[in-house]
Design a protein with these regions (language model features):
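Glycine-rich loops and low-complexity Gly/Arg-rich segments
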Residues: 24-27, 33-36, 102, 147, ...
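Surface-exposed amphipathic alpha-helical segments
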Residues: 15, 131-171
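Residues that flank catalytic or metal-binding motifs in active/ligand-binding sites
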Residues: 11, 119, 152
């Protein structure tokens, strides 16, 4: 998959992957100087990956698709929180997390969905802050589903802030 917004993925067979940014104000290029600070709604890129086809209309954390997951399906969202909060507080951990079945639970979903399970990890990579949100179609089948999710996560590539600045990209 081509690198879009500094996010790319080489998914295992059977995964659908999309990178998008909602309409809104694009943040300044990494390293750009801003003359006057103005409060604006800034949108950031989101990478979605799923073992089933995804509807075009879906939320950043998978609303519109996680409800459709079958018992063997997996959904992954990599949500960019920007450079301003990277490497500190909630985003202090470095690098993509390793997924394990023990990290998943039905109570980790944004709202209750019978039978499903999720995990959520906050981290930084290359001066950028992220949330990795993963939903399994069946909590009971997490021992089989988590390795599939982990295989996808291993193929994620995040372009660091400095490289984006050199290339004139927008995180």
């Amino acid at each position: 998959m081509a690198d879009t917004y500094g996010l790319s993925c080489d998914p295992p067979r059977g995964w659908q992957v999309a990178v998008m940014r909602r309409p809104g104000t694009v943040p300044p290029a990494a390293g750009a100087r801003i003359a006057v600070a103005v409060e604006q709604d800034v949108t950031r890129p989101v990478l979605h990956a799923c073992t089933r086809s995804m509807p075009a209309d879906r939320g950043d954390f998978g609303s519109g698709v996680v409800e459709l997951l079958g018992p063997d399906d997996v959904f992954v969202a990599l949500v960019d929180y920007g450079t301003e909060v990277a490497d500190q507080g909630l985003f202090e951990k470095q690098g993509l997390p390793r997924l394990a079945p023990s990290q998943f639970g039905p109570n980790r979903l944004q709202r209750p969905l019978p039978g499903r399970s999720a995990s959520q990890h906050f981290f930084s990579s290359g001066g950028r802050a992220f949330c990795l949100f993963t939903v399994l179609g069946s909590h009971a089948r997490r021992m089989a589903s988590v390795p599939r999710a982990a295989a996808l996560v291993k193929t994620l590539h995040i372009t660091d802030r400095a490289s984006l600045a050199r290339e004139g990209g927008h995180p």
